[in-house]
Swiss-Prot record:
EC number: 3.2.1.52
Tissue expression notes: In third instar larval and early pupal brains, expressed in cells sending projections across the interhemispheric junction. In adult brain, expressed in mushroom body, ellipsoid body and pars intercerebralis.
GO BP terms in the entry: brain development; carbohydrate metabolic process; glycosaminoglycan metabolic process; N-glycan processing; rhodopsin biosynthetic process
Gene3D superfamilies according to UniProt: Chitobiase/beta-hexosaminidase domain 2-like, Glycosidases
Protein known as: Probable beta-hexosaminidase fdl
Function comment: Involved in brain restructurization via hormonal control during metamorphosis. Implicated in N-glycan processing.
Pfam families to which the protein is assigned, alphabetical: Glyco_hydro_20, Glycohydro_20b2
Cellular component terms (Gene Ontology): late endosome; plasma membrane
Length: 660
């Protein structure tokens, strides 16, 4: 009896144990499946190589060139080498230089790999200062190449994204080459099939480093492979042409995520020159303040796109951020805060940095209108009222937007202050044949409150001529060859001599003033509000009233705008068009949006003014090839830390031709 009970108990214990073991096994199996499922969700198409390391999902694709288009196909590994998107794009179809060369280009289909440490410079010029400036430009060229490699290291591949490293300041960072970074990680140093890249830059003629609309910007570039060495030669007549050659060379180099090396063409030839002399971007730093670093970042993009004029709208009625040596009261009374100011050193630093990238800084102190905050201290200094209508309400009676403010045209101290500021700015930015006086949107009702003059427009004319005379005194008694003013009711008269003044036309492209200004003999710079104003289309920023301008100007709008063709200008009139400029007024833009509001739309203007491609196919439709090239250029901007706006879904960027 006791034996039977013992047996039953033993069987019960065994059964319980078996059930427990089966339960544990079943539960573990479920967990394993769940983990595998979750991992599959996280890495939907992950594979492993022979050593067991996971293969990134993007490397399961390769690209092949068919009918000048890169086609994405599955890559199964062992028999054929994977071709990355960027390497396919750079060797398939038309030349991938932005802006497109105007004269001659030839790129081989064969490419070579190398590391940034393999690149060396030799300068051939009779001018010592040009040699020094080219060495500076080349140093920054190498830093840009290192930045591209650094960006890839932190996780970007053939289609870049804005990484943590690229969002930080790029101008004083101690960046190491990517080959070194990868070597430290994997224990080996990557070596390309080139052992040396020798860059020779020859400046044949001018030793002048001063900016002028007469600068020779032409250049020739060639590369030739000799064994394991690549010979690069850039030939130009001036520093400015040579600098554009460096920008082109930078666009002939790319970073391949397959071997983590830089690549370029085995052989190439480019001969290039701009169609227009003035290729500008205007940034308003009064309505919002922008740091020196953000301005430099903008200039980097301009240099890569071969733009040559940074128009710095330094002050306006909203604020006066510039700290004048002679009249610091302007910033004390006019800046938003102590930290939101530009010192003399800041302006010099920006100008010197811009020259490295072939960009001239053109500062503008708008006058007599658009001058309010910062100008209210005159009576305390015994200088009388320097400005009128400052912050006056209702603002719509006395200015175009709040706050109001207009300089006093009958106070001699007003002109003395302007002369001193002009003198300072010319010292900071260097000798020039171009200066901007402002001069637009004067509200005559403001002055009418204070003066009984029957010809208030004549008072406006007198002010501009006085400002011109003071500029001449500030410039050692010589007026710059081109003194610019904004188009206005005043430029519709013959008050300002056409031999001295250039008009920046901001009104609509169909307005009669476009024709009248040319007929009256003025040189012009086009900045039409309906095409090249980049602040439009974001709605009204006031509680009442419509937006200042709408709709949004797409990069296609910017690109297709050819006013000289649509106006059917003859050769004489077209010669009066110095070029064009996109404008970024900053009522609704601060440093957080600057990059994506500017880029890549500004690049669209760059090609319009450098290349001026024809409208043979359609005046309104952008050719598909342009989409592909500007997409690649946009990616280059992102690699340099510029947060350029996306053009279309990433799928479309990786599959050219399927979306457009």
């Amino acid at each position: 009896m006791s034996l039977a009970v013992s047996l039953r108990r033993a069987l019960l214990v065994l059964l319980t144990g078996a059930i427990f073991i089966l339960t544990v096994l079943y539960w573990n199996q479920g967990v394993t499946k769940a983990q595998a499922y979750n991992e599959a969700l996280e890495r939907p198409h992950s594979h492993h190589d022979a050593s067991g390391f996971p293969i990134p999902v993007e490397k399961s694709w390769t690209y092949k060139c068919e009918n000048d288009r890169c086609m994405r196909v599955g890559h199964h590994g062992k028999s054929a080498k994977r071709v990355s998107f960027i390497s396919c794009s750079m060797t398939c179809g038309d030349v991938n230089i932005w802006p497109h060369p105007t004269q001659k280009f030839l790129l081989s289909s064969q490419t070579h790999s190398f590391s940034v440490e393999d690149v060396q410079l030799h300068v051939d010029t009779a001018h010592r200062e040009v040699r020094k400036q080219l060495q500076l430009a080349f140093d920054w060229f190498l830093k840009d190449l290192r930045l591209i490699q650094r960006l890839d290291y932190v996780g970007s591949s053939s289609e870049p994204t804005v990484s943590e490293s690229s969002s930080k300041s790029r101008h004083h960072a101690d960046l190491e080459p990517a080959a070194t970074l990868f070597g430290a990680t994997f224990g080996v140093k990557k070596a390309g099939d080139l052992t040396s890249v020798q860059v020779k830059i020859s400046v044949l003629k001018s030793g002048d480093l001063n900016f002028s609309l007469d600068n020779d910007e032409t250049y020739q570039l060639s590369t030739q492979t000799e064994g394991h060495r690549l010979q690069v030669e850039i030939i130009a007549n001036s520093y400015f042409g040579a600098r554009h050659g460096l920008s082109t060379l930078q666009q002939l180099i790319w970073f391949d995520d397959e071997d983590h090396l830089l690549h370029t063409y085995a052989n190439s030839k480019v001969k290039d020159a701009p169609k227009f002399r003035y290729r500008g971007l205007m940034l308003d730093t009064s309505r919002h303040f922008f740091s020196v670093e953000s301005i430099k970042r903008t200039i980097v993009g301009m240099g890569l796109a071969k733009m040559n004029r940074f128009h710095w709208h330094l002050t306006d009625a909203q604020s006066f951020p510039y700290i004048s040596r002679y009249y610091p009261e302007l910033a004390v009374h006019g800046a938003y805060s102590e930290s939101e100011t530009y010192s003399e050193q800041d302006v010099r630093e920006v100008a010197e940095f811009a020259k490295i990238y072939g960009v001239q800084v053109i500062p503008e102190i708008d006058a007599p209108a658009h001058a309010g905050n910062g100008w209210d201290w005159g009576p305390k200094r015994g200088m009388g009222e320097l400005a009128m209508c400052i912050n006056q309400q209702p603002w719509s009676f006395y200015c175009g937007e709040p706050p109001c403010g207009q300089l006093n045209p009958k106070n001699n101290y007003t002109y003395l202050i302007l002369q001193r500021i002009y003198e300072e700015l010319l010292q900071h930015t260097g000798p020039t044949d171009f200066f901007h006086l402002g001069g637009d949107e004067v509200n005559l009702d403001c002055w009418a409150q204070y003066f009984n003059d029957t010809d208030l427009r004549g008072l406006w004319c007198d002010f501009m001529l006085q400002a011109m005379a003071r500029l001449k005194l500030a410039n050692n008694g010589v007026a710059p060859k081109h003194v610019a003013v904004w188009s206005s009711a005043l430029t519709n008269t013959k008050c300002l001599p056409n031999s001295q003044f250039t008009v920046q036309v901001w009104g609509g492209s169909t307005w009669q003033e476009n024709y009248d200004l040319l007929d009256n003999g003025y040189n012009v710079i086009f900045s039409h509000v309906d095409a090249w104003y980049l602040d439009c289309g974001f709605g009204s920023w006031r509680a009442t009233g419509d937006a200042a301008c709408a709709p949004y100007r797409t990069w296609q709008n910017v690109y297709k705008h050819r006013p000289w063709e649509r106006m059917r200008l003859d050769k004489k009139r077209k010669k009066q068009v110095l070029g064009g400029e996109v404008c970024m007024w900053t009522e609704q833009v601060d440093e957080n949006q600057l990059d994506n509001r500017l880029w890549p739309r500004t690049a669209a203007l760059a090609e319009r003014l450098w290349t001026d491609p024809s409208d043979d196919h359609d005046m309104d439709i952008v050719p598909p090839d342009v989409f592909r090239r500007i997409s690649l250029f946009r990616n280059r901007l992102v690699e340099l830390g510029i947060r350029a706006e996306a053009l279309f879904p990433k799928y479309c960027a990786q599959n050219p031709g399927e979306c457009i």
